[in-house]
C-alpha cells in the first residue's frame, strides 16, 4: 500500500474517502468488539477504529498492537459520534474505520512515554534521542527550525545573495574560545582547526568580488562546560560589499520580517528600534535588554548624595554610581527573607550588598530608611526612581559594571517572578555604537568587544594611532536583540592593511605574531579590498525563541549534554592504538570514559 496522506492532516475534507496511513501506535483502547488506536506521525494523531463489522482480519491485527508499533492501515474517513468529538485534536471531528492493517515493525516498551510534558532526566532523553524526537513538542521545534531555514534561503536568493560554503578544516587562530583541533596524518605534528565562524573566509569572499554572500554555517567552539551552550552550533551568516551599517541592518530586518511571517504568521513592524550600547546599559543594565517591560534603572546619585549613608557616599566619592529599580507593588510581595536571598545572589556580580526601602504613604520603611527622613527626601527619591507608594526600591552602589550587572539581573529576574512580561510579544531591538574593546577580568587584559576585524567609528580611528588610548574608541558594530537574548551581531569590517595592523598592535600583537596568524588576511587587504560588513544570527537561539523553548537543546536534533558529550553514541570516545599511531599521537593522561577533564 502507498501512503495517501499524513495521519495528522485527516479532517472533514476527507470524509467518505479511502486513505492509506502509516505511523506509530500512540495509544490502544480495547472495548472488546471495538479497538481504538491513536495513530501518530509527524503531522499529528488520528483515531482509528477496528471492528468485526469492518474487517475481522484488521481487528485481529489490532489485537496484537502495542505502543510504538509501526503499522500501515487502510480505511474510510467518517464523522465521529457527537459525544466523541475531541476539540483538542486537529483531527478530533473524524476517525478512520479500518478494513486493512499490517504490522511493519514491533517495538519494545520505551523507557519513557512518547508524549509531551514527560518527567524524565535530560540524560535519559539524550540517550534515547531517537525516541525523544518522536514527541510532538520536539517535532514542532524542529519544524519551526526548518521553516526558518527555508525562509532564509528564499529571502537571500530573492535579494541576490550567493550561498557559498566555506571550509571546515582550516587554520587555528587562537583568539577567544579554544579551537577544536584536528590532527593531520599527512603533516604530522600539524593541526587543522574546526571554524569558530566563517568570519575570515566570508571577508575574503568580499575581496574576491562576490558582493553578497550568505550561508547557514556550522560552527565549533571548545568552550568551558557551563550554561546553555553547545560545542557545535549553527548560524545564519551574511556578508556584503559597499553597504553601510544601516543598509545591512535593513536587509536583516527584511530577513526577520519574512521569517516571522512565514514561520509564525506574524507581521512585524520595521525598522526596529535602535539604541546605543551606552543607553542600553544606562537604562536596562544590559547590552541585550528585554524591552517588553519597564522597571528601568534610575540614577539616584543626586537624590541620595546628602543623606550621610556611607555606602552611597563612598561609591559616589570613588567615581561610582548609585542606581535603583522600583519594583511595582513589591512592598507587599517581597519579604525580607526573599530580598536577603537576592542580596546574597548578586554578590556573584561583585556587589557587596543590596540596599532597599519600601515606599509607603508616610515615607519609607526598611533598613536604610532612617537616612532619608529629611524634608524633600521622599519627593526627591520617588521622583528620581519613578516610584509610588507600594513599590519596593532596590539600590546598588558601586562601579558602573557592578551596578549595571546587579540591577540588570534583578530587573529581569523579578519581572519573570511577577509575571510582568508579555510572552506573546516579539520585541526586536538594535544595540549599536559598541565600545571597540572591553576589559576581560578573567584574563586581565583588553579584548575586542566583538572581534579584531571590526571597523572603528570614523571619528574614533585616530585612537588606534601611537600615543592615543585605543580603549576610548567605539565601533561600527551592531547586535540584534530579541526579548532579552542576543539573536546575532555584526559590524563593518576593517578593509585596509594599515588599519588592521594598528588594530592588532592595540591588542598587543607583535608584527611577527600578526603575520603568522593572519598573514593571509593582511596580504589580501593589500590587493584592493572593498569596504564590507555583515552579520550572523544564531539559528539555534532563533528557533528556540520562536518555538517558545528555553534551551537550545530542544531545537537541535542531536545535541551534546552539559559535559559536551553525547550519551546516545557515547561521543567523544577512545580510538584505536593504530589510529593514534597513524597520527603519531600519544595520550599521556587519559581519563575514564565518563569523566571530563573540566
Swiss-Prot record:
Transmembrane segments: none annotated. L-aspartate binds at residues 175, 221, 450, 493. ATP binds at residues 221-223, 230, 486, 538-541. The keyword ATP-binding applies. InterPro entries: Aa-tRNA-synt_II, aa-tRNA-synth_II, aa-tRNA-synth_II/BPL/LPL, Asp-tRNA-ligase_1, Asp-tRNA-ligase_1_N, Asp/Asn-tRNA-synth_IIb, AspRS_core, GAD-like_sf. SUPFAM superfamilies: Class II aaRS and biotin synthetases, GAD domain-like, Nucleic acid-binding proteins. It catalyses: tRNA(Asp) + L-aspartate + ATP = L-aspartyl-tRNA(Asp) + AMP + diphosphate. GO terms for molecular function: aspartate-tRNA ligase activity; ATP binding; catalytic activity, acting on a protein; nucleic acid binding; transferase activity. Catalyzes the attachment of L-aspartate to tRNA(Asp) in a two-step reaction: L-aspartate is first activated by ATP to form Asp-AMP and then transferred to the acceptor end of tRNA(Asp). Belongs to the class-II aminoacyl-tRNA synthetase family. Type 1 subfamily. This is Aspartate--tRNA ligase. It comes from Lactiplantibacillus plantarum (strain ATCC BAA-793 / NCIMB 8826 / WCFS1). The lineage of its organism: Bacteria, Bacillati, Bacillota, Bacilli, Lactobacillales.
